[in-house]
Amino acid sequence: MAISKGDKVRIRREESYWHNEVGTVASVDTTGKYGVLVRFEKTNYFGMQGTDNGNLTNSFAESELDRA
């Protein structure tokens, strides 16, 4: 599928907070299992506890992503 930096992707990993969400590929590293770093607009559940902190990125395997 050859995902590259800047591509919009949909997350297929069911246990992910961002399942079925669309994010932007921030970087691709082909040396590891979870080599695709995806950036999202909204923070995950760590940012929902009265603070502005939270993760905006997560790493995924290329097989867990679909082009959006």
UniProtKB/Swiss-Prot annotation:
Topology in the lipid bilayer: Peripheral membrane protein
Pfam family, any one: PSI_PsaE
GO cellular component: photosystem I reaction center; plasma membrane-derived thylakoid membrane
Entry keyword DNA repair: no
Major location (coarse): membrane
Biological process, per Gene Ontology: photosynthesis
Keywords: Membrane, Photosynthesis, Photosystem I, Thylakoid
Record's keyword annotation contains Membrane: yes
Top-level taxon in the UniProt lineage: Bacteria
Cellular compartments annotated: Cellular thylakoid membrane
Similarity annotation: Belongs to the PsaE family.
Protein task: Stabilizes the interaction between PsaC and the PSI core, assists the docking of the ferredoxin to PSI and interacts with ferredoxin-NADP oxidoreductase.
Protein name: Photosystem I reaction center subunit IV
Organism of derivation: Prochlorococcus marinus (strain MIT 9313)
Gene: psaE
